Amino acid sequence: MSTEGGTSECEWRTIKLGDIGKISMCKRIMKSETSPDGDIPFYKIGTFGGEPNAYISKETFEKYKSMYSFPKKGDILISAAGTIGRTVVYDGEPAYYQDSNIVWIDNDETKVINRYLYYVYQLSPWQISTGGTIARLYNDNIANAKINIPSIKEQERIVSILDRFDKLCNDISEGLPAEIEARRKQYEYYRDKLLSFEERKNA
């Protein structure tokens, strides 16, 4: 049996994000270790996905990078506070990230490729915990979030389609607002169709 787009339902299975890798974060940086300018940008939750307003020394960066968890190029960074679930693809350039507020899954790409994860995250698969007035994404929220995955080959096919739509949306960013909105809605429709399936039992 196949679904729209030619995806065979029997190829899909449901897993928890915690099954594909450890949830990781950088070493805590103390305020005294930062400065308004310097060698290595330090992204806090307020500057994540934007321009940094704090920096750390190259020595501190190299020390912590070698001793503690640090993302690999292509890993998908997730904001656990502020704008919950905002994602940034780590580009491999020297940078450091605020502990606990910015996390990633040290993903096993033999199970799920990072770019597929990036698009899945846009669907916000996690349940957000609230304490008082502050919403937060805890490690357990991420680890227990369920996603549906096909074979690696099918993941690559889906990513290829969504990447093309993504590029198309960006290419018309200078166009008419109505045209841009229509294209974005089309992109979101196909993204949801390709990624959203009823929960399946693990094979």
What is each residue range found by the language model?
Residues T3-K27, E179-K185, Y190:
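Non-catalytic DNA-recognition/assembly elements of restriction-modification systems
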Residues G18-K31, G46-K73:
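Sequence-specific dsDNA recognition surfaces
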Residues W12, L17, I40, D75-L77, ...:
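Short, structured motif recognition centered on aromatic/hydrophobic residues
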Residues K44, F61, K65-Q122:
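A short beta-sheet element
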Residues A143, S151, K193, F197-N202:
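Structural preference for solvent-exposed beta-strand-turn elements
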Residues K16-G21, G92-A95, V103-I149:
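Basic, amphipathic alpha-helical recognition segments used for DNA target recognition
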Residues C169, S173-L176, I180, R184, ...:
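Coiled-coil heptad-register positions
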